[in-house]
Amino acid sequence: MGQKIHPIGFRLGVTKEHKSCWYADKRRYPELLQEDLAIRQHVEKNLSNAGIADIRIERKADQIDLAIHTARPGVVVGRGGSGIEQLRTGLQQTLGENRQIRINVIEVSRVDADAALIAEYITQQLERRVSFRRVVRQAIQRAQRAEVKGIKIQVGGRLNGAEIARTEWVREGRVPLHTLRADIDYAYRTAQTIYGILGVKVWVFKGEIIPGQDEQAMAAPAPTPRKKRRPQQFEDRSNEE
């Protein structure tokens, strides 16, 4: 089951959180859900070159809190905050109402360990007609330098312009999809090539999340330094009778 199901949806409520956090009754729920979709599409379309990794949406009454996780925050913010103002104005026009929108830009610290940014990098290279094996190898090497526990990359379609479509994947390290406490980051992107569409899937294993581990680490006393052991000496008595 863990091999087929969506890795993030499988772990919602266990180790993952929802990307939209708000409550609405059954009458307004479809409307707000469509608004969330419109907001995400608008941000991804207008900030396609900003390296958007994640978009989080929270609602409080008539206020929308938008958190944009990006690899290039300078592109989103713009000079003197002009980029945020343009984004806010565009979102208000898209929603059709004068909504109060608060935008928070968060920089992604480990770019080469984020599944969405890795998948975006691979699709950009594939659209430039770079060999998929070379691109996948480079992405895995960059992820290993970022000290991830494991990574799996799958590319499907008419690879390198082949007549028959196929799927190939490469895995380095551990990617335990069945383990619920495993912190798995997953992303799916499509590359538009002259031969057709290529699908790119990326799984990144960042370690296991154990409940209460941080609390135990804070409460644990500092380890006492160990005493130095005397160097042991061994005598060769193999020649003795």
UniProtKB/Swiss-Prot annotation:
GO terms for molecular function: mRNA binding; rRNA binding; structural constituent of ribosome. Gene3D superfamilies: 3.30.300.20, Ribosomal protein S3, C-terminal domain. One of its GO terms (biological process) is translation. Keywords: Ribonucleoprotein, Ribosomal protein, RNA-binding, rRNA-binding. Residues 232-241 have a biased composition (Basic and acidic residues). SUPFAM superfamilies: Prokaryotic type KH domain (KH-domain type II), Ribosomal protein S3 C-terminal domain. It holds the Pfam family KH_2. InterPro entries: KH_dom (IPR004087), KH_dom-like_a/b (IPR015946), KH_dom_type_2 (IPR004044), KH_sf_prok-type (IPR009019), Ribosomal_S3_C_sf (IPR036419), Ribosomal_uS3_bac-typ (IPR005704), Ribosomal_uS3_C (IPR001351), Ribosomal_uS3_CS (IPR018280). Residues 215-241 are annotated as: Disordered. Residues 39-109 form the KH type-2 domain. The keyword Ribonucleoprotein applies. One of its GO terms (cellular component) is cytosolic small ribosomal subunit. The keyword RNA-binding applies. PANTHER family: 30S/40S RIBOSOMAL PROTEIN S3 (PTHR11760), SMALL RIBOSOMAL SUBUNIT PROTEIN US3C (PTHR11760:SF19). HAMAP family: Ribosomal_uS3_B (MF_01309_B). Binds the lower part of the 30S subunit head. Binds mRNA in the 70S ribosome, positioning it for translation. Belongs to the universal ribosomal protein uS3 family. Part of the 30S ribosomal subunit. Forms a tight complex with proteins S10 and S14. This is Small ribosomal subunit protein uS3.
